[in-house]
Amino acid sequence: MENIGRQRPIGVFDSGIGGLTNVRALMERLPMENIIYFGDTARVPYGTKSKATIENFSMQIVDFLLEHDVKAMVIACNTIAAVAGQKIRQKTGNMPVLDVISAGAKAALATTRNNKIGIIATNTTVNSNAYARAIHRNNPDTLVRTQAAPLLVPLVEEGWLEHEVTRLTVCEYLKPLLADGIDTLVLGCTHFPLLKPLIGREAHNVALVDSAITTAEETARVLAQEGLLNTDNNNPDYRFYVSDIPLKFRTIGERFLGRTMEQIEMVSLG
């Protein structure tokens, strides 16, 4: 019976497809885990919506994942984590719920040497102040500098990961953070890990915190602690659910995932 509990999937969700960077990190860190992903591609972006709407949409996704009997959830969306994280945890009770902001903040604090941390994220995540709050909860003396970097999202989706336009945009966004002397930079949007090589070159001597990797690490730690790690599954099942299959979805999705997406199914929520 205990083994059946361990075989249950991890549920990962996002407002769109960026959260597939989290799925990729989970596949690499926990290769025996079954994973269900839900991307709300019909209603993306969440960043421009009200708190009540984001909470409402998030609850619908949580219900969907609970119906699929997941053993843990990963909020692979900075906006949802910032706005609806608390409500989601209230609903799921004792189930482990991980999120990119908590994991990213924790990793940034463990990485910084001079206590100056930069965050690049979308407008909503920056305006929510969620990263600064999570960091200051653990260390109130840390200087946290945030920079909204909304133009990077469409550039990543276009596949311009090494394009000169992207490089110039990154440089522009990094200027104020580097001027403040940060030694650690959190990639606070699920699209940004794809720009890690480029950002690393433009922000040399700055440690990059990839919240997809740190969330996967945290998931592994919590599952082990709860006795939920799947250690007996050489053929994991990966399922991808979306609320719409927009143009180029598979192409962009496979770029994020770093492999082919076989089981994509469309479902409507709400």
Curated annotation (Swiss-Prot):
One Pfam family linked to the record: Asp_Glu_race
Enzyme class, broadest EC rank: isomerase
Domain of life according to the entry: Bacteria
Pathway stated in the Swiss-Prot or TrEMBL entry: Cell wall biogenesis; peptidoglycan biosynthesis
GO terms of biological process kind: cell wall organization; peptidoglycan biosynthetic process; regulation of cell shape
EC number(s) from the headed UniProt entry: 5.1.1.3
Any one GO molecular function term: glutamate racemase activity
This protein's UniProt keywords: Cell shape, Cell wall biogenesis/degradation, Isomerase, Peptidoglycan synthesis
Annotated active site: C77, C189
Family matches, as PROSITE patterns: ASP_GLU_RACEMASE_2 (PS00924)
Catalytic activity: L-glutamate = D-glutamate
Family: Belongs to the aspartate/glutamate racemases family.
Function comment: Provides the (R)-glutamate required for cell wall biosynthesis.
PANTHER family: GLUTAMATE RACEMASE
Full protein name: Glutamate racemase
The organism's taxonomic lineage, starting at the top: Bacteria, Pseudomonadati, Pseudomonadota, Betaproteobacteria, Neisseriales
Gene: murI
